[in-house]
Amino acid sequence: AQAIGKGGALPWRLPEDLALFRRVTSGRPVIMGRKTWESLPPRFRPLPGRRNIVLSRNPNFAADGAEAVRSLAEATEAASRDEQAWIIGGAAVYAEALDVVDVLVVTDVDVDVEGADAFAPSIGGSWRKAAGLPERGWLASGRLNYRVSVYFQPGVNADDVVRAVAGRGPSRI
């Protein structure tokens, strides 16, 4: 499984992935778990230019500048008035959301993370790969190699997401 967290933080610094994240989520609701919310640097809470929706089982949890909800169903209902929302972590939210979402944008980083404590769920079942950036091999950022893949469920048109990921589409998809 791909490591996605260590000690409450991303285990790498990948500016290109952060730029992609900003580009595809700007103007859209972002849904995240409490630990992901707490891992954001305070100056980025809430993430600017996006509706921030935070999941927590704690009924007393409050996220200043964000909407606190108790379940993924409640989060998706809160975001339903928007055309598209993004699930941005963490591991438990990703795993639960695989049954709800129809498009995935996945950044694979070619690195072994010793002591990782959060992992992305496996993508299987009916998911189909729409595109990869690059189509073969890896992109490089400093000493890290990475690639971005877009997956979709059958019957879903992922073209707008593919164009945005490739930097050829609207900044708001």
Regions found by a protein language model. Name each.
Residues A1-I173:
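Enzymes that bind and transform nitrogen-containing heteroaromatic metabolites
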